[in-house]
Amino acid sequence: MKILVLLDGSKWSYKAAINAIEIAQRKDAEIMIFSVIDRAETRSAAFYFCQQSNRCDLVNEHEEKIYRDLKKSIGEDLNELTLNMNRMNLKGSSKVVEGRREEEILKEFKSGDYTLVVMGAFGKRSNIRVGTLFNEISTSVNVPILILR
C-alpha cells in the first residue's frame, strides 16, 4: 500500500496527515506527504486583500508575505509529521513543489503508483473555495480518496 497525503498548511490537512500516518503504521504502508505552493493562489489572496482593505499599493508585498507564511507553515507541519513518521519507523518521504495545484497533484499521483489519497475536508482558504480540490482531482484519480475533518 502506498498513501499520498495532500498537505496545504491548514489544520484540516494536518489532521488528515496524522490519520494517514496511523493508517500507514497499521497497514505497513509507504507514505508520501505532498504539498503544492500555487503562486496564482497567493496572488489571488493578495488581490482579495487589496480589494477589501483599499490598499492596492501593498498588493505585491502582501503576496510575498502570504507566500512566505504559507511556505513556513507547510515546512513546520512537514517537520513535525516527518518526526512522527521517523519515531514509528515508517517508510515515507515528503515533497513540496511550486506550480498549479491540481496539475502538480495529478502529476505526483500518476508517477507514484499510489493506492490511497488522503486529504483534509477543507483547505487553507476554505471560506473561498470549499471542496474545489476534491472536485478537480476526483475524476482523474482512480483510487479511494479519504477526506478527513
Predicted regions and their residues:
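Absolute protein N-terminus
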Residues: M1-K2, R149
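Structural beta-alpha unit
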Residues: E80-V117
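Conserved beta-strand positions in the Rossmann-like core of class I SAM-dependent methyltransferases
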Residues: M32, S93, L146
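Small/aliphatic-rich secondary-structure junction motif
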Residues: K2-E61
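A short acidic, glycine-rich active-site loop
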Residues: N54-G75
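Generic structural signal for helix capping and beta-alpha/helix-loop junctions
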Residues: A40-E41, E102-E104, S126
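Gly/Ser-rich helix-loop-strand patches that form or flank binding pockets
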Residues: K107-R149
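Short glycine/serine/threonine/alanine-rich loop segments
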Residues: A29-E30, L90, V143
